[in-house]
Amino acid sequence: MRKARVIGFILSCFSILSVCAAQDEPKRAPSTAQERQRFLALTRKLEQAPLDKTLYDEKAWAKQWLEDIPDINVNICAPVLFGTDFLREQAGEPYKYTPQLSYQATFGEAAYIIEHPDKKGDTTAQYLAGVESALKAYSAILKSDATAKSKSLDDLLEKQKQGKLADFVRDSSKDCDDKKEGM
């Protein structure tokens, strides 16, 4: 009887380990060249027309695709996306288009990784690409909805015009990169 319990316990442990290992396995094979091109085209379309409802199905595909593929991993750093001022603004009345811009920043980072596979480890360059992509989308939103202004996003556009956006991103991302290194 005792031997049966020990064997049962061991088998239970193995089954738990196999479930845990299965969760670490990729959901699918690496991305294909065709999928990457589709994703890049969508990212550029969304920079120009982030509110285009005809792109919503493609956007849903892109979100799921990024979750599933094992070969493109995007790092998210909330302070970098739009800055701590933007995050503070969100505590009051949230900016209407935050979800669109957040996804655009993520898509912009992934697009950078696809276009620059040799820079997969350069998180600052990835963050910068994401912010630049989101700022393009923000500018496009303002063309269709002039009331959709955000002081912090306007400040980022100004930093971009002055050539100071890269410094801002580098400084803002230090906390995120420090946390990654400490893991």
PLM feature segments, named:
Residues 54-175:
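Mature extracellular/secreted ectodomains of secretory-pathway proteins
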Residues 20-34, 162, 170-183:
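Non-catalytic accessory regions used for complex assembly or targeting
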Residues 8, 25-28, 48, 92, ...:
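Residues at structural and domain junctions
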